[in-house]
Amino acid sequence: MKKLMVVAAILPGLLACSTPGPTKLAITVLSGGAVEPGLNAAAAAFQKETGHPVKVTYNTTPQIRKRVSAGDTFDVIVAPPAAVKEFAAAGKVEQGGVNVGRVGLGVVIRPGAPVPDISNAEAIRRTVLDAESVVFNRASSGLYFEELLKKMGIYAQVEPKAARYATGAEVMEHVLKGKGKEVGFGPITEILQYKDKGTRLVGPLPAEIQNYTAYTAVPMSAGANKDVAQAFVRFVGGKGKPLFVAAGID
């Protein structure tokens, strides 16, 4: 009898210890792919500090515009300021976004490929004309590069050998699988993500033609978890900022 009484007294405590606590609300984020390494690190740090999981979906800026216009809803958007301004005008995002950082463009080749001269704008022009294939994306950085080719007066010559992809990952895969004189252009952060697979960052575009794409994090107006979304945006612009800098997003 005494044993039964002891068990009865202990059992509620054991059940309380084994019962999991309340699940923390998860937030969803739609972001441009160029900030992926920094945002992944910040999301992990935020979850560790607060217990709130962060589920991130990466798309190009044109895809983000399309999804937001179609009514897709996330808790937070991370996109270039011009896109965020459009979303704000349409009432899709809240006020109080924070600057995440900016990403510059770089030149990428596969292992063993001849290293091109990228020392100045004229060298880039020669490199592009000499390449058998010129690879870049259809996102913000790719649109800039296309305009750069037009300003250089060589777009008509480059277009037949240009390979354009929706994502940076596809650009890197094309370069890695190449067998000739392929040269790729894309955000430096995306190039570095494929370093372990063999991509070689030749270097950034020269200063006179470099282009930086900035990114802003902002809560969506129709987000389901507004308080957590706002906390995450504050974290990204504060404690999480060094994680972006460490990933090459300055």
Regions found by a protein language model. Give the residues of each.
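Exported/periplasmic ABC-transporter solute-binding proteins
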Residues: 18-62, 66-72, 81-90, 95-103, ...
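Phosphopantetheine-dependent thiolation modules in NRPS/PKS and related acyl-activating systems
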Residues: 75-76
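Bacterial N-terminal signal peptides
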Residues: 5-16
